[in-house]
């Protein structure tokens, strides 16, 4: 009999007598008969599906626990993926062999690259997604993933045991307790609870306990986390009403067609499943003063707006927009929900007014005069955990082998959740096999920026990814996510397939070869002008001009360059992606050199590790103010670089910490050298004894 300390109670269990509480849907014929897994993932949303499949790809026997299997892959809010900053996350998730990008390519009904007026480093790939197709394709993928078992069930509590002495944390998670009292054991547990922790839905003055419309919240688990000592906050979000397509007058609205050709999210796909000519348009309309009037006259009927709980700054409700920006017109994008769906999603009209007032407001808008509301908009309020309580691997400081991913960490958006899910799944698996964590730094990816911001700065409002948050965005582009992460994912995490790894290696070597060839081809400027007349090349240049420099001109691409110099450039035009990436590399060549130097400087700071067991409150070897000590104690940064980004930690404190780290490293090196010398002398003594 083994005993585990639960939240304020003792949980007793015998490993030999455990019975599995419910029949499970398994894609793994080798799933254990006893309920013991390597990794348990709680929640089947966008973070949970990525976490579960990532852990399984890494070789861990994984259990995905969800309230309902038929809601796996459900897009609870907007029917779209990607956007500015978010599209970068999608490419990075795909580079680590995640699911959502490939599923989007199979399910998209309208593809558009945003930010085209700017450089390719900040282009944002976005797609409208068929909700029904996405859910079907995701469930098919999940239920056919080796080593992954899916089970319906709600988690009420965590099973805890004594901590591992070599790691920080006051206890260790070793399983979960379901609402029916049954238990399942695991080496690592990942919480991806979304908006379900003590979630409530708000419409007007009415509130209902729910994580989303039609699904029950998670109460017991929220209480467990609070009793364990986690700092819990409260956030809110919302979704707009759904409108009947047939009731909208599209003929008077501004029509927006998809890009042709469509750019896929996944590096493994050359095209998307639904051809551009078969894709659906979106339409644009605007609010007007009558909308403002309805909002302002009925604030007393809207408890969600009156709440002090913080909502998403960059996806506000229409009520928030009217209050913050009075007398302005606001865009409303009418987005299709699927190829055969009768519903339209009015992006920009998230609201929590009473249902009858929602329809009254909508019919004030141009093109929606006869619109019928099929489902009212509603708000959701839910618990989240201060993300400064987790490490860059997404493991919690308080409880060993417990990982958080998704909205539980204070983020908003499918893409942010998916990115965290992949990292949590990888690291939960690596923790089981006692391997070093897989951490993406700020210099390596948008995922690194996302996690670093959360773990060092925390958040008091739903966090959304933007390109403006990234210091090295010229290097961290959507086109090169595979070069940055796929090779690492294969070698350091084991989460990338052999086929994807080989493709990334081929692309990397082809790019290096292509750039080398382009640098080697040189002609006079006048000759280049004759070869490519459309290029605005100045003929007054006296020095030879490289083909790589010619490719920098906006009018020139690899096709026109290959026509001018067929050999050896023609072969680089056969792969469209390779040709486009060579163009991008040429565009940024001069600035990338300087940015790489800056990255090296940052990496040096990141390489200076702070001792994991450092007690900032009592340490005497470093001069720190009481305020700085408290901030460092709460956030527990792992590197000097991370410590420098914590608000309130002064440059003087960083210098003192830097001195402390270097002194500690010198002492450790001296001790290691002394130990080697002692070992050498001992070996010499033994050798002499044998000779005698």
From Swiss-Prot:
Residues 1-25 form a transit peptide. Keywords: FAD, Flavoprotein, Methylation, Mitochondrion, Transit peptide, tRNA processing. Its main location: mitochondrion. The keyword Flavoprotein applies. The modification N6-methyllysine is found at residue 508. InterPro entries: FAD/NAD-bd_sf, GIDA_C_N, MnmG, MnmG-rel, MnmG-rel_CS, MnmG_C, MnmG_C_subdom, MnmG_C_subdom_sf. It catalyses: 5,10-methylenetetrahydrofolate + uridine(34) in tRNA + taurine + GTP + A + H2O = 5-taurinomethyluridine(34) in tRNA + 7,8-dihydrofolate + GDP + AH2 + phosphate + H(+). It is found in: Mitochondrion. It comes from the Eukaryota. PROSITE patterns: GIDA_1 (PS01280), GIDA_2 (PS01281). HAMAP family: MnmG_GidA. Homodimer; forms a dimer in the presence of potassium. Interacts with GTPBP3; forms the GTPBP3-MTO1 complex composed of homodimers of GTPBP3 and MTO1. This is 5-taurinomethyluridine-[tRNA] synthase subunit MTO1, mitochondrial. It comes from Pongo abelii (Sumatran orangutan).
């Amino acid at each position: 009999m083994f005993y585990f300390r639960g939240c304020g109670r003792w949980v007793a269990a015998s490993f030999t007598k455990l019975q599995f509480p419910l029949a499970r849907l398994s894609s793994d014929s080798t799933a254990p008969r006893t309920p013991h897994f390597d990794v348990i993932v709680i929640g089947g949303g966008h973070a949970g599906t990525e976490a579960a499949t990532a852990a399984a790809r890494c070789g861990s026997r994984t259990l995905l626990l969800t309230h309902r299997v038929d809601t796996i892959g459900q897009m609870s809010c907007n029917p779209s993926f990607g956007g500015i900053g978010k599209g970068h996350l999608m490419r990075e998730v795909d580079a680590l062999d995640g699911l959502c990008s490939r599923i989007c390519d199979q399910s998209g009904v309208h593809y558009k690259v945003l930010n085209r007026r700017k450089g390719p480093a900040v282009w944002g790939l976005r797609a409208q997604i068929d909700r029904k197709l996405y859910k079907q394709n995701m469930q098919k993928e999940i239920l056919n993933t080796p080593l992954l078992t899916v089970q319906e069930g709600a988690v009420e509590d965590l099973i805890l045991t004594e901590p591992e002495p070599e790691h920080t944390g006051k206890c260790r998670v070793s399983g979960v307790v379901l609402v029916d009292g049954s238990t399942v054991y695991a080496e690592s547990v990942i919480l991806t609870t979304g908006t379900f922790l003590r979630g409530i839905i708000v419409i007007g003055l009415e509130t209902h306990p729910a994580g989303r419309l039609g699904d029950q919240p998670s109460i017991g688990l929220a209480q467990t986390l609070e009793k364990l000592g986690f700092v819990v906050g409260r956030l809110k979000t919302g979704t707009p009403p759904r409108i009947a397509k047939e009731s909208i007058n599209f003929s008077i609205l501004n029509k927006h067609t998809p890009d042709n050709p469509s750019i896929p999210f996944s590096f493994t796909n050359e095209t998307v499943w639904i051809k551009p000519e078969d894709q659906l348009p979106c339409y644009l309309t605007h609010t007007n003063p009558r909308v403002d009037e309805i909002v302002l006259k009925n604030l007393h009927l809207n408890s969600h707006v009156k709440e002090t709980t913080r909502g998403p700054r960059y996806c506000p409700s229409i009520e928030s927009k009217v209050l913050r920006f009075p007398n302005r017109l606001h865009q409303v994008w009418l987005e299709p929900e699927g190829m055969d769906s009768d519903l339209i999603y009015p992006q920009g009209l998230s609201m929590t007014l009473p249902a009858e007032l929602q329809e009254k407001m909508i019919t004030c808008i141009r093109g929606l005069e006869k619109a019928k509301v099929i489902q009212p908009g509603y708000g959701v309020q839910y618990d989240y955990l201060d993300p400064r309580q987790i490490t860059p691997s997404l493991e919690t400081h308080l409880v060993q082998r417990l990982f958080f991913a998704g909205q539980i960490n204070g983020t908003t958006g499918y893409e942010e959740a998916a990115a965290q899910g992949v990292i949590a799944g990888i690291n939960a698996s690596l923790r089981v096999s006692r391997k070093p964590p897989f951490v993406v730094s700020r210099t390596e990816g948008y995922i690194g920026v996302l996690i670093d911001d959360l773990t060092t700065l925390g958040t008091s409002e739903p966090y959304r990814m933007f390109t403006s948050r990234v210091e090295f965005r010229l290097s961290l582009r959507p086109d090169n996510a595979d070069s940055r992460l796929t090779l690492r994912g294969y070698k350091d995490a084991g989460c990338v397939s052999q086929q994807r790894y080989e493709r990334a290696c081929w692309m990397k070597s082809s790019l290096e070869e292509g750039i080398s060839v382009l640098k080697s081809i040189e002609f006079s400027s006048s000759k280049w002008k004759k070869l490519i007349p459309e290029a605005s090349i100045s003929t007054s240049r006296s020095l030879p001009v490289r083909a790589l420099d010619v490719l920098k001109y906006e009018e020139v691409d690899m096709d026109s360059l290959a026509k001018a110099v067929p050999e050896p450039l023609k072969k680089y035009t056969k792969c469209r992606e390779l040709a486009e990436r060579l163009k991008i590399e040429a565009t940024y060549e001069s600035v990338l050199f300087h940015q790489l130097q800056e990255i090296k400087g940052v990496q040096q700071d990141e390489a200076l590790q702070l001792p994991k067991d450092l007690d900032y409150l009592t340490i005497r070897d470093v001069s720190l103010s009481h305020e700085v000590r408290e901030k460092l104690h709460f956030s527990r940064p792992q590197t000097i670089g991370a410590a420098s980004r914590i608000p309130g930690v002064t440059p003087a404190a960083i210098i003192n910490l830097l001195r402390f780290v270097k002194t500690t490293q010198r002492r450790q090196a001296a001790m290691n050298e002394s130990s080697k010398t002692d070992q050498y002398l001992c070996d010499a003594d033994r050798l002499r004894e044998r000779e005698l």
